[in-house]
A protein has these predicted regions:
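Short beta-strand micro-motifs enriched in acidic
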Residues: 64, 123-127, 206-210
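C-terminal active-site "lid" helix and adjoining low-complexity regulatory extension at the edge
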Residues: 1-8, 12, 168-171, 175-178, ...
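A short catalytic or substrate-binding loop motif that flags glycine-/basic-rich loops and adjacent residues
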Residues: 39, 51-53, 113-117, 197
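A long amphipathic alpha-helix within ATP-dependent nucleotide-binding catalytic cores
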Residues: 96-108, 133, 145-206
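Phosphate-binding site of ATP-dependent enzymes
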Residues: 42-43, 76-155
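Glycine-rich phosphate-binding loop of ATP-grasp-fold ATP-dependent ligases
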Residues: 24-26, 45-89
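A conserved helix-loop-beta module that forms one wall/lid of the active-site cleft
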Residues: 1-58
């Protein structure tokens, strides 16, 4: 089954879609000028490996303007460092990324659940008719001391309905979830036009305080087992069924 690991390649492809483009945070290749430019524009950015998974290597960078000047801070895992000037901070980040290729992306101030940020995984798979279907959705809450939500990085999976309850209710909530599923579907269709052969994708989406969804990443080898963390197993059974149809978990 085909996969595509480069976040930069996937970003460039998605930017070609009129339906998807407006949900992609501004993203550039990592260098000294691009990080500073986006920091000045947004005050908060994320630096992430071009090739990577499970939230490993993701760094949050903040710019705080004060009367005495600018202060810079970054967090990597549970550790954070502060600097009085940009050059020192950039040098430190450059050393920590171990010469790998990185991206810098506009930071999104995401919604929180119990004072912890969360994002959403939309699972989109080819079904029995070989048509794309948004087969599953789940929320992922970050560890209190971490900036990433991945289950493999101490994140906690929860029903999306639970996480959205404070912000949208009733039929409006169901309509909102349908819109998220449709966004995942549109991404799968568009990506498959440029790179035929995909059978599954996992779309990671963050929601800002105006309830706008932002596409953080499209994973072309998504882990279906996260859905087993939900008490209601119906979604998990569907996701696993489609995964097997698509060639996952074959017996050796």
């Amino acid at each position: 089954m085909r996969t595509l690991t480069s976040k930069w390649t996937k970003t460039l492809v998605l930017l070609k879609s009129n339906k998807v483009r407006r949900y992609i945070p501004e993203t550039r290749l990592f260098n000294k000028s691009s990080v500073l430019s986006l920091l000045k524009k947004y005050q908060m950015v994320y630096v992430k490996p071009v090739n990577g998974s499970f939230g490993q290597g993701v760094i949050r960078v903040d710019l705080q303007r004060t009367k005495s000047g600018s202060k810079y801070r970054y967090q990597h895992g549970t550790a954070s460092r502060s600097f009085g000037n940009y050059d020192a901070m950039y040098s430190s980040i450059s050393k920590s990324k171990l010469k790998r290729s990185y991206l810098v992306q506009k930071g999104i101030h995401m919604l929180k659940y119990n004072n912890r940020v969360f994002d959403i995984r939309i699972m989109v798979q080819k079904n029995r008719e070989r048509k794309w279907e948004a087969s599953g959705y789940i929320g992922r809450v970050a560890h209190p001391k971490k900036i990433v939500t991945n289950f493999h990085n101490s994140g906690k999976p929860l029903p999306l309905e639970t996480l959205l309850e404070r912000f949208v209710q009733g039929e409006q909530k169901q309509a909102y979830i349908r819109d998220l599923k449709n966004l995942g579907y549109q991404i799968a269709v568009h990506l498959n036009k440029h790179y035929p052969g995909f059978r599954e994708i996992g779309v990671d989406i963050g929601i800002d305080k105006e309830l706008k969804p932002w596409i953080f990443e499209v994973n072309t080898a998504p882990d279906p087992l996260i859905f087993n963390q939900l008490k209601d197993k119906r979604m998990f059974r569907k996701v696993i069924h489609y995964a097997r149809l698509n060639g996952r978990f074959r017996k050796k």
